[in-house]
Amino acid sequence: MAEPSLPLSFLCLLALSSACYIQNCPRGGKRALGDTALRQCLPCGPGNRGRCFGPGICCGAELGCYLGTAETRRCAEEDYMPSPCQAGGQPCGSDGRCAANGVCCSADTCAMDAVCLEEGSEQAEEAAEKNLTVLDGAAGDLLLRLMHLANRQQQGKQPGL
């Protein structure tokens, strides 16, 4: 009698291990996840002028980025939303999106990225400098110099200059 119960026990164990648990089950079951459309992430920051990029990241074109501050508290609610969201503009970095001028953010971190710079104005450079306020002085100075160098190299490659 022990032999037929062993495969039956194994089959039951397999069925239970691939179940959809209450905590992580999307609406409509496991197969419905591909059908859900991306929505815009929750607003955050002063005057709700930013968007959540992760549980502790709030960015906006006018604001720059807040990392782990009081302005990002609302972004923790995003983990409890039933559908996925997407914030930001064009893709950048390995898995990020442009969050503010010159800043690329993923769900975990933000970094300066030349892909996210608005084309060539001094106001764009000033806005990128303003976004560095979350960094300490030495790191901010180094990143600022690297961004200026990258911008000069990019302008030097344009024909007719």
Swiss-Prot record:
Chain positions found as Glycine amide: G28
Compartments (UniProt record): Secreted
Intrachain S-S bonds: C20-C25, C41-C85, C44-C58, C52-C75, C59-C65, C92-C104, C98-C116, C105-C110
Annotated signal sequence range: 1-19
Primary site of residence: secreted
Annotated GO MF terms: neurohypophyseal hormone activity; neuropeptide hormone activity
GO cellular component: extracellular space; secretory granule
Superkingdom of source: Eukaryota
UniProt-listed InterPro entries: Neurhyp_horm (IPR000981), Neurhyp_horm_dom_sf (IPR036387), Neurohypophysial_hormone_CS (IPR022423)
Similarity annotation: Belongs to the vasopressin/oxytocin family.
Official protein name in the record: Vasotocin-neurophysin VT
Organism per entry: Gallus gallus
